[in-house]
């Protein structure tokens, strides 16, 4: 084969590989918040948002390896949930330009102060629950999500009245947190 053709084929393969490796979004997960909400509304599903630090957070890596990256989780979750990855890697080249721009805004919007944080939204985009790493594998994690979501409406009945009791409101922490510091 001609040397020029070999070099051209090698360059094409490298560009294709670079384009494919440009994202840290796992198979079966979206990285676009608006697209996830639209899909959830259209399919009447909850959105599971994984706020992760994929290249530096040990607990995030464990959650991914033990739960989210498994076929059992992806198959079980696909029936009930829209999966959204909001990654905050130190190596920003792992993100698409859109994710690099939007992910810090989502971390702030959802007041994420530590990683991993898993936020579940209903099909209307309202927060239902939040959690993080849970040991036990994909079956146990899916069961925990199902149970928390099932009981969330009952729990909210009691939490909302308490929130404004005695003229007070829960204060969200302010200042620079570890999560926000990691994004800068």
Regions found by a protein language model. Give the residues of each.
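Thiol-based oxidoreductase modules, predominantly thioredoxin-like and allied folds used
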Residues: 27-30, 52-53, 66-101, 115
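Loop/turn elements at helix/coil->beta-strand transitions in domains of secreted/extracellular proteins
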Residues: 43-47, 79-85, 113-116, 123-126
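Thiol-/selenol-based redox modules, centered on thioredoxin-like
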Residues: 134-184
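Bacterial Sec-dependent signal peptides at the C-terminal "C-region" and cleavage site
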Residues: 17-27
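Bacterial N-terminal signal peptides that target proteins for export
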Residues: 1-9
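Bacterial N-terminal signal peptides
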Residues: 8-18
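Local sequence-structure signature of Cys/Sec-based thiol-disulfide redox active-site neighborhoods
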Residues: 31-73
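Non-catalytic, surface beta->alpha helical segment in thiol-disulfide oxidoreductase systems
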Residues: 66-68, 105-154
């Amino acid at each position: 084969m001609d040397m020029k053709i070999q070099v051209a084929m090698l360059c094409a393969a490298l560009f294709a590989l670079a384009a494919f490796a440009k994202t840290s979004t796992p198979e079966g997960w979206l990285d676009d918040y608006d697209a996830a909400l639209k899909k959830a509304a259209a399919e009447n599903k909850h959105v599971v948002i994984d706020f992760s630090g994929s290249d530096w957070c040990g607990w995030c890596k464990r959650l991914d390896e033990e739960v989210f990256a498994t076929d059992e989780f992806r198959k079980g979750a696909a029936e009930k949930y829209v999966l959204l990855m909001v990654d905050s890697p130190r190596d920003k080249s792992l993100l698409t330009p859109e994710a690099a721009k939007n992910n810090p805004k989502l971390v702030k919007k959802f007041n994420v102060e530590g990683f991993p944080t898993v936020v579940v939204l209903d099909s209307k985009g309202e927060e239902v629950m939040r959690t993080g790493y849970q040991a036990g594998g994909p079956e146990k994690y899916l069961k925990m999500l199902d149970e928390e979501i099932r009981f969330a409406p009952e729990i909210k009945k009691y939490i909302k009245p308490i929130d404004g009791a005695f003229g007070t409101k829960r204060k969200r922490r302010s200042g620079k947190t570890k999560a926000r510091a990691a994004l800068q």
